[in-house]
Amino acid sequence: MIELREKNGSAVFVVKAQPRSSKSRVCGLYNGGLKVNLKAAPVDDAANRECCELFSKLFRIPPSRVHILSGQSSRTKTVMVEGISSKAAALVLEPFG
């Protein structure tokens, strides 16, 4: 199960990113968080932007409402989805874990 927290009315969870994959997608669970494959290389913040875009499409919100709180230069990232409660996020992320 995905470990979700709530911070100021926004869902927060951990993501393990794998850059330079053949396509961008959510793969499933990884140590209480989500594992994602990202097509972009980790150069000039491209993989971080792609990670935010992936979750914005998944939650059907603008990319500006998805933030990486920590791990900008790491494969393990803490992601916040602004304006989505942890309960609503759990429903969206349920198929992945």
From Swiss-Prot:
Belongs to the UPF0235 family. InterPro entries: DUF167 (IPR003746), YggU-like_sf (IPR036591). GO terms for cellular component: cytoplasm. It comes from Pelodictyon phaeoclathratiforme (strain DSM 5477 / BU-1). NCBIfam families: DUF167 family protein. This is UPF0235 protein Ppha_2415. Gene3D superfamilies: YggU-like.
